[in-house]
């Protein structure tokens, strides 16, 4: 029986057929709407360009830079660096991002909440020192504000205020960073 063997019954109470025919989609609004146009049923992007991102754990900035430059030649166009406090210095930032076109490659950083402000300032200063057009440079600063509370059972005082401050300083230094 088709319904018994092939139709998936979801927990939300609707059935999903394994295939659809033209008459199944005749009255759907999605067939007339275009991607990137109101009412955004098919998303806000009008193109299908995706970033190919590679995460790199930074134990040694020179090794991480070498790995980053190597994978950039293989089609990657977004890098994610996991950075510890010891590596957040102007010298290390210069070594980490050496020979990387930061205006055209998305650069993302992961660190802990204690080091986020220092990382934002160091990155902003480095971009300024090499005359990067910050309206073109894209990326993000990422940290988990609840990690300390969940892992150690200790509250991080004023984490919401600090998060707002970090977002403000990052948006001033690097407007296209999230």
Regions found by a protein language model. Give the residues of each.
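Catalytic alpha/beta active-site cores
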Residues: 1-178
């Amino acid at each position: 029986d088709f319904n018994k063997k092939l139709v998936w019954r979801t927990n939300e109470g609707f059935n999903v057929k394994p295939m659809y025919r033209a008459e199944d989609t005749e009255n759907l609004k999605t067939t007339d709407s275009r991607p990137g146009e109101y009412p955004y049923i098919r998303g806000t992007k009008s193109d299908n360009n995706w970033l190919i991102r590679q995460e790199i754990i930074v134990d040694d900035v020179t090794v991480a830079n070498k790995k980053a430059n190597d994978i950039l030649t293989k089609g990657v166009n977004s890098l994610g660096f996991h950075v510890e406090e010891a590596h957040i210095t102007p010298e290390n930032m210069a070594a980490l991002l050496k020979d990387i076109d930061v205006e055209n490659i998305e650069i993302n950083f992961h660190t802990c909440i204690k080091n986020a402000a220092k990382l934002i300032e160091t990155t902003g200063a480095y971009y300024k020192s090499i005359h990067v057009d910050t309206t073109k440079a894209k990326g993000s600063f990422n940290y988990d504000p609840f990690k300390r509370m969940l892992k150690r059972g200790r509250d991080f005082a004023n984490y919401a205020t600090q998060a707002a401050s970090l977002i403000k300083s990052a948006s001033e230094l690097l407007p296209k960073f999230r």
